[in-house]
C-alpha cells in the first residue's frame, strides 16, 4: 500500500526553482512520504534525478504529459 503523497506544483518556474521546492517538501515530509513534483522546465528532467541521487532519495516514477514532467520521489 502506498503512503501519503505531497504534490509540489512548480509549473511555470525555471530551474533551480523546481528542485528547491522539491527539497523543501522532502525536508518537511515524514519518512516514507512520497512527493510528486510537477514541472514544465525541460532542465528538470536532468536536475531532479541528479538532486535525488545526491540526497539518497528514490525516483519512483517519471512521466510526461505534453510539456509537463511529473516526478514521484521518496526519501526514507
Question: Language-model segments: what does each one mean?
Answer:
Residues 8-63:
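Amphipathic, hydrophobic secondary-structure cores in small proteins
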Residues 1-4, 76:
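Short, low-complexity, intrinsically disordered N-terminal peptides in bacterial proteins
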Residues 70-76:
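Core SAM-dependent methyltransferase catalytic element
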Residues 5, 34-36, 68-70:
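Intrinsic-disorder/low-complexity, polar/charged segments enriched in Ser/Thr/Lys/Arg/Asp/Glu/Gln
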